């Protein structure tokens, strides 16, 4: 009996759950099912809370006026109950603006307390599934990667190059096509409840100047799950460019 309980505890541990997802992610033909039940594991929220609390920017109050430091076991239990019967509905994010380097303002969407906590659990799950399939040339919003690792790779790979072209996808986060994103997720995830939850986040809308606005496209900057969704979306572009570059090299070699 004690052995059975110990095994059950190990299998419930967030580390075990996420490592199991990562191991299966190596097989690109593997379809992930029954992901949604991970949200019923209280321990996932303890880990999520610790990770969020470690980042000062995540302490900003959402549209509900509450911060992540107001967590309690009762709140987690209520959240899990609403997830089990799928009555959970994310609140609209609070729109605020921060200055950009060019003097313009960048819109951010700050999620409500419960949404922030749940988004971190979603982010951990998606990272475990997708991180190893991302291209090595991708450095944004990834563990142990940054603009500094990108510059280091450029220095090593393009030592003889004198000119570089810098580009930006205008309004990228605001213009992500929801249906395309959902289609990409379904290539690896065969869990409709999990997909429906992602849709809820995408369609939650935002509040600005006390007015509600629908979100027909995009995923708000400032949302905890937004960066990983953006990387999943852009991974298709990375893989296309990798294949295109290989074709160019092949063509040059043939000439």
Placement of each model-derived feature along the sequence:
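Short, conserved non-catalytic motifs in the polymerase core
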Residues: 56-69, 90-117, 133-145, 165-166, ...
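Conserved catalytic palm subdomain of right-hand nucleotidyl-transferase polymerases, strongest
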Residues: 58-67, 109, 148-185
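Reverse-transcriptase-like RNA-dependent polymerase core
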Residues: 52, 82-104, 113, 117-125, ...
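Short helix-interrupting loop/turn segments at helix-coil junctions
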Residues: 126-132, 191
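Generic recognition of stable, solvent-exposed alpha-helical segments in well-folded globular domains
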Residues: 12, 16, 30, 34, ...
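Conserved small/polar residues in nucleotide/adenosyl-binding loops
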Residues: 249-255
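Nucleotidyl polymerases of mobile genetic elements and RNA viruses
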Residues: 174, 179-248
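Non-catalytic, polymerase-adjacent accessory regions of viral genome-replication enzymes
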Residues: 1-77
